[in-house]
Amino acid sequence: MPSFLRGILRPKERHHENKNHSQMSSDSLTSSYPTSPPKLEKTEAGSIISSTTQKKTSHHANLTITTKTEQSQRRPKIIDQVRRVESLGEQVSQKQRHMLESLINKVYTGPLGEELVQTLYLRIWAMKETPESTKILQMREDIRDQYLRMKTERWLRTLIRGKKTKLRDFQKRYEEVHPYLMMERVEQIIMEEAWKLAAHIVQE
């Protein structure tokens, strides 16, 4: 074949070969990486997301219902316990007040009161003389007894103040009035006797 024909034919052959090669490469790439239509992917993804969201929402709703049910079951028990404790506190406080009033009534009317005023009279008579002790010893007996009962009642109400009183409460109140008692020996004697009468109430 003449050389000039070879020069003409070779570019055409190369162009044809390149075209075939590029087509084959394209086909091989297409066959190697199969893809789905974009719309189908989006649709499938959307359905998957929607399904997952529904599952999560349903699960969350179930948890919420369960939690509310548990809370509703617990709440009555907690409320009952609180009410029971409060009612016990009220009962104890009422009992203590009732015991206090009953004790004061005995101080004025019963044999306990008679024994109390005799004890106070003897202790005041035996103590070192003070203006207050002298005044009490010079009183007429019935007036003196009533006076000592009233003093005792005042100390009882000071020691037992309505609400539940414990031993530490009495100790605190005693510390508050201690300086006064050191100057008023008669008051200290009456307070001590009042405490002896009220000790069983404080310990309830």
Swiss-Prot record:
GO biological process terms on file: symbiont-mediated suppression of host innate immune response; symbiont-mediated suppression of host JAK-STAT cascade via inhibition of STAT1 activity; symbiont-mediated suppression of host JAK-STAT cascade via inhibition of STAT2 activity; symbiont-mediated suppression of host type I interferon-mediated signaling pathway
* Keyword Manganese tagged: no
Q: InterPro entries, per this entry? A: Paramyxo_C
Q: Which Pfam families match?
A: Paramyxo_C (PF01692)
Region named Disordered: 1-75
Biased composition annotated in UniProt, kind: Polar residues: 60-70
Show the ranges annotated as biased composition (Basic and acidic residues): 10-20
Q: Which UniProt keywords apply?
A: Host-virus interaction, Inhibition of host innate immune response by virus, Inhibition of host interferon signaling pathway by virus, Inhibition of host STAT1 by virus, Inhibition of host STAT2 by virus, Interferon antiviral system evasion, Viral immunoevasion
Q: Where along the chain is composition biased (Low complexity)?
A: 25-34
The similarity comment for this entry is: Belongs to the respirovirus protein C family.
Instruction: Return the protein name.
Output: Protein C
The organism that produces this protein has a lineage beginning with:
Viruses, Riboviria, Orthornavirae, Negarnaviricota, Haploviricotina
- In the UniProt record, the gene name given for this protein reads P/V/C
